[in-house]
Amino acid sequence: SLVGSEMCIRDRYSDDKFIIMSTANGTIKKTNLQAFSRPRSVGLRAVDLAEGDYLVGTAIVDGTKDIMLLSSEGKAVRFKETDVRSMGRTAKGVRGMRLDPEHKIISMLIPSEGGLLLAVCQNGFGKRTELKEFPTKGRGGKGMIAIQTSERNGPLVGATQLFAGDEIMLISDQGTMVRTRGDEVSIVGRNTQGVLIIRLKENEKLVRIARISEPSEDDPETSEDGTNAVSYTHLTLPTNT
């Protein structure tokens, strides 16, 4: 098994908290946090994955959140957490987003007040967009355009939620790493191409982005996106456990 996602837990496995999980093939799953309260040295099965599928995102939710999934096609779907019923650890989950065979989910977000969507494509172009431009609809659809994946841009390779003061790290397939302030990325509309964020060499491709959050003065261990820190739970790709 490979570690697919890692999160921090401070809610002491409360029965009113859930782990929401999304996979590359568009599956979404919600499981009560208490189901993971007794970890084993070999790990616990978190989701039953189809062959070739893998985990792309996890978060802790409380029954009141919205969920956003973003695909390599540059599309996004936003739906209420209550559209996903709670199910056991070994269940497969339900369809979160309908994808064409050549596309994958690349990110899952839990929209928060004050957050902006950062979307960056393979050729180094990207943008920030107000989350209010993405209305809440039912799960399972093909989604709406979050960024144009034109020939200039290439496919969407990274998406995250940014807050004031955050920085971002951009990483290419040739090992180039650029750190920049998120506030310097242009805020533009949903159905646009964005602007150049990182200049790449010929045949060089952007492969990953990472958000570097501004610590909170009140609680430096608390993230804006629901992954609060105290102890760690590792969700691994399932074994025969």
What do the predicted segments below correspond to?
Residues T82-R85, D183-S186, N240-T241:
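Short alpha-helical interface patches
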Residues G165-D218:
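Positively charged, low-complexity, intrinsically disordered RNA-binding extensions
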Residues I9, E202, T222-S223:
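Intrinsically disordered, low-complexity regulatory regions of eukaryotic regulatory proteins
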Residues S213-L235:
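Acidic, low-complexity intrinsically disordered tails
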Residues F134, K142-G143, I147-Q148, V185, ...:
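Single-stranded RNA-binding regions, centering on S1/OB-family and related RNA-binding modules
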Residues S72, M97-P101, M144-R152, I197-E217:
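Positively charged
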Residues S1-I9, T236-T239:
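Short, small-residue-biased leader/transition segments that mark boundaries at the very start
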Residues E6, R10-M144, N153-M177:
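Conserved structured catalytic cores and adjacent interaction surfaces
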